[in-house]
Amino acid sequence: MSVAEQHPPAAPPTGPGPGPGATRPHRRTLARPTAAGLSAATALLLCVGGGVWAFSALRLNIATLTDSADNAVNFLSRTLPLDFPPTGELLSLIWQTLAIVVSATVLSVVLSVPLALLAARNTSPGAGARAVSRGVIVLCRAVPEVVFAIAAFRVFGLGGMTGVVALGVHSVGMVGKLYADAVEQTDEGQRTALRATGAGRLQQITGAVLPQALPSLVATALHRLDINLRASAVLGFVGVNGLGYALSTAITTLDYRRAMALAVVLLLLCFVAESVSGAIRRTLLQDVTTARRSRRSWPVFPGARRDERPGGTAQARPSPPTVAGPPAGGGTAVRRTLPRWSARRIRGTTWLVLTVALVVASAVRSGLSWSTLRRGAESFLPTLGDFLPPGTGGIGGQLLADLWVTLQIALAGTLIGLVLALPLGALAARNVVGSPRAARFFRTVILLVRAVPELVLAIVFVVVTGLGAVSGALALGVGSVGLLGKLVADSLEETEPGPARALVATGARGHQVFFGAVLPRAWPAVVGHLLYQLDVNLRSATLLGIVGAGGIGYDLLNAARVLQFPVVTTVVLMVLALVLLIEGLAVWVRKVYA
C-alpha cells in the first residue's frame, strides 16, 4: 500500500472556495528568505566574485603555468642531488628549532590561561575585563609573528629568545581564544557544588573549571606546537636560529641543493610532529566527548557506575573501601585521599616528568635566562618609542597599492584552495567515499600538504614563476588544501546520518545523497571554514612578501631593514584593519547561518 493510500487526502473546506478553473494555492517548501540571510549570501557572493576577479587580475591561467614549465625543470635540476648538512650539524639545527618551538608554545599557554579565564563568560569578573582580554587575544592573532620577531629582535637581539617571544605572543591569539571556548563549555555542576561548600572564586576555578578543561587545553597546545614548527621557517629570515635561518642562508647564496634538503627535513619534522600530536589530541578529545556523552545519556545512582563503552548500561558494583582499618596499636581510622599507584597513574606520571624535562631542556637550549629577560624589560619602552608614532616614510601610496595586491593574493589563494580542498575533503570523509582505506589515504595526502610550510611553497613558486603576486597566490592556494581540506572532511563526517539514510532508502545514488543530504547540512560549517581560511591567507600573504611573493610584506621587510620602524607600525595597522574586517564578516555570517 502506498503512502497516499494509507493517508487519503483531507476533505476540502465547506466554505466558499475558488470557482471552476481556479488554480489551487501551492504550499511553500522553503522558508522565506530573511534580510539577514540575503545580506550574508550577497557578502559571500562578493567574496567569491572577488576571488575570481583577483584570479584574473593576477593573470593566473594555464599560459602562465605553461610558460613556467621550463623554469620548473631547470629548478629541479639545480636541486638534485640534495645536499644535506653533516649529521651533527643537522641534529643541532633540529634541536635548536624544536627548543624554540616548545618554549614558545609553553609561553603561549602560560599567557593564555589567565587571558582565557578573563575572557570566558563563566569565569570573567566583569564585562570590562572580558572585553579587554578578548581585544588582546584578537590583537595577538591579527599581528603576524614576523612583526613580533622584528620588535623582539630590537629588545633581545640575536638568539633564541627572539623566536620564543615572537612565536609565543602571536600564539596567544589562537590558544587564548580556544582556551576561552573550552572554559565556557565546562559543566557548571561541579563549580556549583564547590561554591555550596564555601569555596572562593579561585578555588572554584582550580578545583572545578580547569580540571574539566585540561584535556582540551593540552590538545590545543599540541595543535599550536605543530603550527609553530611550520612558522619557525619564517622567523629564520629575520635572524632567528634554527632550520629556518639555515634555509634563509642557503636561499640567499642560491644554494638550492642545500635549501631543498633543509626543506625536506623541515617537511618530515612537521609531518612526524603532526602525526604524533594528532593521535594524542584525538585520544584526549575522545575521552572528553565520551565523558560528556555519558553524563548526558544516563544518570548515576549510588553504588552504580557507567560502563566504559559509550551507550553501555550502568552496572551495580560495591564501592571500594575508602577507609583503612584501624592500626594495630588502636587508633583513629585514616581516610585515603590520594588514588592508588595503578599502571595508568604510573604511566601518566612518567609522561608528566618527561614533559617537564623536555620543557626545561628546551628553555636552556633556547637561551632563556633571567638576565636576558631583565635586559629586555629595560629596553622595552625605548624600543616601543621607535615604533611610535606611525608614519608612511613618503610611500603611503605604494603601501595602499601593495595592500590591495595582498588582498588579491589572499582572495585568489583562497579560491584555489576551495577548488582543490572541496573534492579532497569529500574523498577524505568516510561517510562520503564509503571506504575507510580510501578515506585514510586522502587524509594522509591532506596531512602531507599541511606539513609543508607556506614559505617553502612560496620559495619554490618564486623560483619557478618569478617574483611577484602569482607565486604568492599559488603558494597560498596549495597550502590552503592542508587546513581547509581537513576542516571540510571533518564537517562532512559530523553531519547527521538520518537525511542521507532517508535518501538511500528511496533509491538515490551516491552523488544524489551527497548533494541532497550531506553537503547541504555541512555547508554552513564549510562557509565558516572558508572565511577563516581567507583570514589566515591574508596574514600569510603578508609574510610571503618576505621572499618576494608580492604584496605589502616586501615593504614591511624593507622598512625593518632600513630601521624605518614607524612604517612597520603603519603596515601592521593597515593589515590589522583588513584582518578585523574579514573576521567581523566571518563572525556575522556564522551567526546568520547558525
Language model regions located:
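Short helix-to-coil transition segments within interhelical loops
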Residues: 185-213, 239-241, 495-496, 502-512, ...
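Generic hydrophobic transmembrane alpha-helix motif, especially the helices
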Residues: 137-171, 446-479
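Transmembrane alpha-helices
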Residues: 201-235, 257, 261, 510-545, ...
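Glycine-rich helix-loop "coupling/hinge" segments at transmembrane-helix boundaries
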Residues: 154, 228-260, 265, 285, ...
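Transmembrane-helix boundary motif in ABC transporter permease subunits
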Residues: 103-137, 412-446
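N-terminal, non-cleaved signal-anchor transmembrane helix
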Residues: 1-102, 106, 277-415, 422, ...
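Transmembrane-helix bundle segments that line or gate the permeation/cavity pathway
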Residues: 3-5, 158-162, 166-171, 176-178, ...
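Membrane-embedded alpha-helices of multi-pass transport/permease systems
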Residues: 111-115, 147, 159-190, 218, ...
